[in-house]
A protein has these predicted regions:
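Bacterial Sec-dependent N-terminal signal peptides
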Residues: 1-29
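Beta-strand-rich, non-transmembrane domain signature
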Residues: 26-304, 379-381, 385-448
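Structural motif marking the loop-to-transmembrane transition
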Residues: 3-4, 349, 411
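Buried hydrophobic packing segments
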Residues: 374-378
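Secondary-structure boundary elements
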Residues: 297-373
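Generic secretory/membrane-interface signal
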Residues: 11, 20, 286, 306-307
């Protein structure tokens, strides 16, 4: 009887494996079919400027030249019936987004030939927050424009799966570009099809300077005005020209028809030195994150006032720090002993702060959420401190914020130069992580 049961289990597992393999095969077949359709649509809608080939004399010795650059972004916001409808009777808010980047690049030497002879990409990624997904399908398209005028379209049916990362758990795809030669042009695009439920989209960054010289650039956005879209132009970047289409979408356009030099290869930070535009697109209501007043205005806003955004962030800080602070009810015995011992100990404010910080850091980790309990614990112990808001390297400066989700909260012991930040391993108390060193900050010395 036991052998019969084991045989039944083995048969069941075998059938499950076959089903999984079939699903994976279907998924890949569906992806390839969709990708082929998208590529054909992109090739059939080639902008006029992608037919230009003239290169100014000053760029003829460059390794590669971007003859034309095109960026397109679109959003559509709607409600969708999901399993949530049967559980709570509510529809799920969803943003459908397409983000495409396309370049026509002239190959001038062996270095460029090597750089553009192979591409890596990820066909699909998925993450979850509060039971709602954020899915991205990426479609890559490549064709080679030969010197004699012929066009060779790269076949993606045989892309190679490559296992990378720790224990080979990260799967990416690679494709070679056969037949590419010096003097050819390569027309390449990457299209992300994104759908996200009850969440804001990841920020979009439009850099107006690239690693190669660019002769012509255009950015085109068609944005659903039911969403809250804000952007800021940095380092001399211009604003978009905004119009409205027949469907009442906001249409943003930016054209740069003058050549732009390549970024320097060394000692260069694009977020500090290159002109760029940072954009956040957020639903005005969502079930997974708090959307404060400054982020609830529908439509598109350019270079908004920072003050309301900071006020919202101070409000959020007070809420989170207070809620996650010290309360003797529900604390584990280990926590209770630590805080009672520190309350009765004859220690300086710095010593108490170092011990609380280190204890929480070791027990709970490096996240902002874990760090938030530290200042409130210290206040309960009678330690005076000042809370602060800043942003890390790579984010917009705190005095040019457009979204409070990019901020970091920290504190300083009052009357000292000792600062405490969330951070990464390894780290000691009162050490400022390099990503915050030299960054602008706002301080507040009151719990209110």
């Amino acid at each position: 009887m036991k052998n019969v049961r084991m045989a039944g289990v083995a048969f069941f597992l075998l059938m499950m494996q076959l089903v999984c393999l079939s699903v994976k095969a279907d998924n890949k077949a569906d992806y390839l079919k969709l990708a082929q359709k998208v590529r054909q649509e992109v090739w059939d809608n080639t902008p006029v400027d992608f037919k230009k080939r003239a290169v100014p004399e000053k760029f003829k010795k460059e390794s590669a030249v971007i003859l034309s650059y095109y960026k397109e972004l679109s959003t559509d916001y709607h409600r969708k019936a999901t399993t949530e409808l049967f559980i709570s009777g509510r529809l799920t808010r969803q943003i459908d987004c397409e983000d495409m980047e396309r370049m026509l690049i002239q190959i001038n030497d062996k270095k460029a030939l090597k750089d553009y002879s192979e591409f890596s990409f990820l066909t699909k990624s998925k993450k979850w927050q509060g039971g709602y997904h954020h899915t991205t399908n990426t479609i890559l398209g490549i064709r080679v424009l030969k010197k004699d005028g012929t066009v060779q379209v790269v076949d993606f049916d045989d892309y190679v799966d490559v296992k990378e990362g720790k224990k080979g758990k990260e799967l990416s795809q690679k494709i070679a570009v056969p037949g590419l030669e010096i003097g050819d042009c390569i027309d390449v695009f990457s299209l992300d099809q994104i759908d996200t439920q009850e969440q804001q989209l990841d920020p979009f960054v439009f850099f107006l300077r690239q690693s190669e010289p660019v002769l012509y650039s255009r950015i085109h956005c068609v944005l659903d005005q039911s969403l809250a879209t804000v952007y800021r132009s940095m380092n001399g970047a211009p604003e978009f020209k905004q119009t409205t289409d027949k469907d009442k979408n906001a249409v943003l356009d930016l054209t740069m028809d003058q050549p732009v030099d390549a970024e320097p290869s060394v000692w260069y930070n694009a977020t500090v030195q290159s002109p760029y535009i940072m954009m956040f697109i957020t639903p005005t209501k969502t079930k997974t994150v708090i959307v404060e007043k400054a982020m609830r205005q529908k439509g598109v806003r350019a270079n908004p006032d920072v003050a309301p955004i900071l006020q919202d962030d101070w409000k959020l800080m007070k809420t989170y720090v207070s809620k996650n602070g010290y309360s003797p009810i529900g604390l584990s015995g280990k926590y209770t002993r630590v805080f009672k011992a520190l309350k009765n100990a004859d220690l300086s404010a710095e010593e108490k702060a170092d011990r609380i910080f280190s204890f929480e850091y070791i027990c709970a980790g490096t996240s902002q959420a874990s760090f938030n309990v530290v200042p409130n614990y210290l206040r309960k112990l009678g330690v005076e401190l000042e809370m602060g808001i800043t942003t890390p390297l790579g984010a917009l400066p705190v005095d040019q914020l457009i979204n409070y989700n990019s901020t970091t909260w920290f504190f300083r012991l009052k009357g000292t130069n000792l600062y405490y930040f969330p951070g990464t391993y390894p780290k000691v108390a009162s050490e400022i992580p390099y990503i915050y060193q030299g960054r602008k900050a706002y301080m507040q010395d009151s719990e209110e």
